[in-house]
């Protein structure tokens, strides 16, 4: 009977210790988030919470047009000439370098 009381006391002391540790860590986290830091400390210790976009050096008029006007279709030979498909050969089968 003495062993069961010792086990019960040990379990309750462990749970009490864990509860106190959890409360302490919660308070520590809460206080660290609410206390304002100086500029030097905030940049060296943690990432900033609020991110601000910098002004662009490129004017907005030079951005890419996502919906360009319809262009005339090029023939297959002009596309081959443009990308040089006739100039190189693509081997088929497994990669000979890795074998």
Curated annotation (Swiss-Prot):
Residues 1-34 form the signal peptide. The keyword Secreted applies. It comes from the Eukaryota. Belongs to the CLV3/ESR signal peptide family. The modification Hydroxyproline is found at residues 91, 94. This is CLAVATA3/ESR (CLE)-related protein 41. The keyword Plastid does not apply. The lineage of its organism: Eukaryota, Viridiplantae, Streptophyta, Embryophyta, Tracheophyta. Residues 80-89 have a biased composition (Basic and acidic residues). Keywords: Developmental protein, Differentiation, Glycoprotein, Hydroxylation, Secreted, Signal. One of its GO terms (biological process) is maintenance of root meristem identity. Glycans are attached at residue 94. One of its GO terms (molecular function) is receptor serine/threonine kinase binding. Changing residue 93 to A: Compromised interaction with TDR. One of its GO terms (cellular component) is apoplast. Residues 70-79 have a biased composition (Basic residues).
């Amino acid at each position: 009977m003495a062993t069961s009381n010792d086990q019960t006391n040990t379990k309750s002391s462990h749970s009490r210790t864990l509860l106190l540790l959890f409360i302490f860590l919660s308070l520590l986290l809460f206080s660290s988030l609410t206390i304002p830091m100086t500029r030097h400390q905030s940049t060296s210790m943690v990432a900033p919470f609020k991110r601000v976009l910098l002004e662009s050096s490129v004017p907005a008029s030079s951005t890419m047009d996502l919906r360009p006007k319809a262009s005339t279709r090029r023939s297959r030979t002009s596309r081959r000439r443009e990308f040089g498909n006739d100039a190189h050969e693509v081997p088929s089968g497994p990669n000979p370098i890795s074998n």
